Amino acid sequence: MGIFAGRSLAADKARQKAFRTAFPSYGPQRSWGGRLLRLCGWGLLLLGAFALVVVIDGWRAFGQGAEGARLERMARSPQWHDGGFENPQPILNNWERTLTDLFHSSPESSPRMPVVVDRIDPKRFATPPEDGLRVTWMGHSSTLVEVDGHRVLTDPVWGERTSPLEWIGPKRWFPAPIALDALPPIDAVVISHDHYDHLDFATIEAMKDWNTTFVVPLGVGAHLEYWGVPADHIVELDWWERTKVKGLEIVCTPARHASGRFLHQNKTLWAGWALVGPQHRVYYSGDTGLFPAMEEIGAKLGPFDLTMIETGQYGAGWPDWHLGPEQAVLAHRLVQGRLFLPVHWGLLTLAYHGWTEPIERSLVAAKHDGVGITAPRPGQDFLALAPPPVERWWPERPWKTAEEAPIVASQIPPKLREGHPALPLLPAPAAVSPQTQAPKPQAGKPPTPPPGTGPAVATPHE
């Protein structure tokens, strides 16, 4: 037995030696190259496992793509080209500048101390606004608009993170000023587009059984239905189309932006909104860069008693995606607004600027241009026709001026900028290299219909 075992051991050693000679990357004497390959293999395996966890965990939050009759209707839109929606003016992306800004982001991009928030007493809604128009800003782009006896929620985001995952992604700085189930009855929920900071899965899922009408751009209804909202509670509109909800006219207006959740990039439309009541009018820009049709919005649907225009989350690397404060003031004038409420700031860190910079620059630009502006605390309501004076509730922190960090949209006719005092705060727009522009619309597509001529779309809740 001992001799047999010894011969077997010797044979094993010989085989191991021959194997190591033939395959030096394996075994205890493998090369550094082999070890690196093995580590890379494990890394790819772990990365794949992480990606699988992300997809599984966030699958429902990613939403659902359009199909069937919904997709056919989308394909008939003048904004639809080559399988997706496009802007009339291509949007500029300067990736080199974006990466540069990433490494020079402001240390003040999020608050160091708790943000001042007004907790909302639900009893306040029992008393209608004296002048017929009252607005409560919840932070970012979420507002409750009470206009001529109707209540409208814009882009409600009550979730903790603007992400498909509950454990990673931009986290809100403070809880919502009021619980969703404490809100009064809502007549309409208006969504501007399907980015996570405007269309929140957790919020919609909590609202799916509400007796309300969801008014959304083309394609967004597929997400809502997938999350349980009844189809007859959803109205989808193209630019310049309109509907009525219990007597309040809601008009879908153009915007210059993009859309996308996971694999669904630019498969749904983005938009702004006009709320047209018997006595008052409100304009909500949604996410947008500057674009010429803003003048047409004002001419066809204005003047507006209140504009709610996005001012934050801008960057020099994406100057056409967001207005920035100075161009927001210009947009307010173009759409013929009376009182300007800056939104899309004060809740999340989604860009590299200081968190107070949007409101600081908005105040400077509004004063320079003679524009009425309001800056309520999150949760604070105000009467749009008699707004309170601006009180600084945010801390004084360092921020960059328009001269230091200008945001200037590309491909804008010079005449659009003429006669607006705030614009000297900005340098002249630089020429856009053709290589940085997105593809132009396909030849032969029908032109966009004239503003204000879009068809009316009926809603079951008129």
Segments from the language model and where they lie:
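Active-site neighborhood of phospho(di)ester-bond hydrolases with catalytic His/Asp-centered motifs
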Residues: 153-155, 185-194, 215-217, 236, ...
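Binuclear metal-ion centers of metallo-dependent hydrolases, dominated by the metallo-beta-lactamase
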Residues: 2-11, 38-44, 213, 228-246, ...
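Acidic/histidine-rich helix-loop elements
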Residues: 158-175, 258-264, 315-321, 349
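Metallo-beta-lactamase
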Residues: 2-171, 176-180, 217-286, 305-312, 361-379, 385-386, ...
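Active-site metal-binding motif and surrounding structural segment of the metallo-beta-lactamase
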Residues: 76-77, 167-215, 302-308
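Active-site-proximal loop/helix segment associated with metal-binding centers of metalloenzymes
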Residues: 158, 254-277, 393-417
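Active-site-proximal loop/helix segments of hydrolase catalytic cores
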Residues: 202, 257-335, 356-361
